[in-house]
Amino acid sequence: VEVDCSRFPNTTNEEGKDVLVCTEDLRPICGTDGVTHSECLLCAYNIEYGTNISKEHDGECREAVPMDCSRYPNTTSEEGKVMILCNKALNPVCGTDGVTYDNECVLCAHNLEQGTSVGKKHDGECRKELAAVSVDCSEYPKPACTLEYRPLCGSDNKTYGNKCNFCNAVVESNGTLTLSHFGKC
């Protein structure tokens, strides 16, 4: 669902760029990137980062969709390891780790084999938009950052309040820190 971004007031920031002023209606919506935003913050992200995220549904994004791995047949290997038997049907699901699995059974098998607890974020392939997200930090570091709150989640699983704070941390990490996704971790 497209969000009408023209209804939000805008101003010019210290870098001379148009930015939206998001202060009023902060009701949560779930973006097509799987991240919870408000409608205004979603528009602000799209403007600032050149993305084209739209609204999936009202309310916060569900972290994971429940799945029942016990419904898949399993066997015990010669080494005594339990293995889930999956068919080859291509019915992709997106894991909470951002990886697309061929089907729900394959995701269950991955968790059993690797000892992980990856959940199902949604049916269908993971959206490429999220993986291609990046932030231009070439103008950083800066000595001071504004207090505007537009959270970004770093690859260190830490939430940064805005692009400036994130980019300063990227510079400090010598480029090892990358953007995981927009929004809180």
Swiss-Prot record:
Intracellular or extracellular location(s): Secreted
InterPro entries named among the record's database cross-references: Kazal_dom, Kazal_dom_sf, Prot_inh_Kazal-m
Site note Reactive bond 3 for chymotrypsin, elastase, proteases A and B, and subtilisin, residues: L147, E148
Keywords: Disulfide bond, Glycoprotein, Protease inhibitor, Repeat, Secreted, Serine protease inhibitor
A Pfam family that the UniProt record links to this protein: Kazal_1
Domain Kazal-like residues, every copy: 1-63, 64-128, 131-185
Glycosylation sites: N174
Gene3D superfamilies associated with the record: 3.30.60.30
An example Gene Ontology molecular-function term: serine-type endopeptidase inhibitor activity
Site (described: Reactive bond 2 for trypsin): K88, A89
Disulphide bond pairs: C5-C43, C22-C40, C30-C61, C69-C108, C86-C105, C94-C126, C137-C167, C145-C164, C153-C185
Main location: secreted
Gene Ontology cellular-component terms listed: extracellular region
Domain comment in the entry: Avian ovomucoid consists of three homologous, tandem Kazal family inhibitory domains.
Record protein name field: Ovomucoid
Species assigned in the record: Meleagris gallopavo
